[in-house]
């Protein structure tokens, strides 16, 4: 980020549009959930996009978050390093992203490492954390800590099974338009582009 110069023209417009998607209220809700979920000595960051980015940038908070969503002994990231080296921090972010995908977050909801590392798209980071919270609430396996109303519950399939007798009874039902001549028909329709014949 330090080596990147300012963007101009269309690039600047696109970046401004991306930055407008960031939600400060959502940031507060996510920070509260992460601190409550991790149940460790994680300090509350000052409000603001850049502080939120710096708080998550080394990957330790994200790794602690994904580990807290699993039962003890089944954590997907066994070793969390608090290294100051850039490639180690980026590696931890990518470990979090892989673990989130395994947990059930769709690949379309997962941000790219540079979105967080360079602060390119912090709204995408928020979307990933929201999707992770939604999956955690939906799983309802006892590992989620926090208000269930903070995240929406994802829809789950509810398959229905019909017996052969029920399927046969469904074939006996007469459709609503069968035998009716008042429904939609093509009477009076002319071909496309032809003039209407009025006599």
From Swiss-Prot:
Signal peptide: none annotated. PANTHER family: CALPONIN, TRANSGELIN-3. GO terms for biological process: actin filament organization; negative regulation of transcription by RNA polymerase II. Gene3D superfamilies: Calponin-like domain. Residues 178-199 are annotated as: Disordered. This is Transgelin-3. Residues 178-188 have a biased composition (Polar residues). It comes from the Eukaryota. It holds the Pfam family Calponin. Abundant and ubiquitous expression in neurons. Calponin-like repeats lie at residues 174-199. Residues 24-136 form the Calponin-homology (CH) domain. The gene is Tagln3. One of its GO terms (molecular function) is actin filament binding. The lineage of its organism: Eukaryota, Metazoa, Chordata, Craniata, Vertebrata. The keyword Phosphoprotein applies. The modification Phosphoserine is found at residue 163. One of its GO terms (cellular component) is actin cytoskeleton.
